[in-house]
Amino acid sequence: MARIAGVNIPTNKRVLIALQYIHGIGPKIAGEIIEKVKIAEDRRVNQLSDQEVLQIREIIDRDYVVEGDLRRETGINIKRLMDLGCYRGLRHRRGLPVRGQRTHTNARTRKGPAKAIAGKKK
């Protein structure tokens, strides 16, 4: 099992799919990494040599923000919005949808489970 960017990627999957187990790497970036290392798309992780795994690891460390660093950066950006007191920051602070979705109905994922209203019956 290869360990890249602090994540154990599955050995029996294709490299393109296995790289997507790393937070911050999707299909597009996984394809770019495979092109840079010049690996065939149908190769599986257990068929990679140690040198190829090392090259993948170096490319990810050098060119991309992934895993803990990406999570930290995202958290810092949200905290910055909340400290500024801008509209998006207020929505984050109140636990409501940030991107303009309706909240009269729906938005239960963001707002949490429904709260019972006292005295309201059919």
From Swiss-Prot:
GO terms for cellular component: cytosol; small ribosomal subunit. It holds the Pfam family Ribosomal_S13. GO terms for molecular function: rRNA binding; structural constituent of ribosome; tRNA binding. One of its GO terms (biological process) is translation. PROSITE patterns: RIBOSOMAL_S13_1, RIBOSOMAL_S13_2. Gene3D superfamilies: 1.10.8.50, 30s ribosomal protein s13, domain 2 (4.10.910.10). Part of the 30S ribosomal subunit. Forms a loose heterodimer with protein S19. Forms two bridges to the 50S subunit in the 70S ribosome. Located at the top of the head of the 30S subunit, it contacts several helices of the 16S rRNA. In the 70S ribosome it contacts the 23S rRNA (bridge B1a) and protein L5 of the 50S subunit (bridge B1b), connecting the 2 subunits; these bridges are implicated in subunit movement. Contacts the tRNAs in the A and P-sites. This is Small ribosomal subunit protein uS13. It comes from Bradyrhizobium sp. (strain ORS 278). The gene is rpsM.
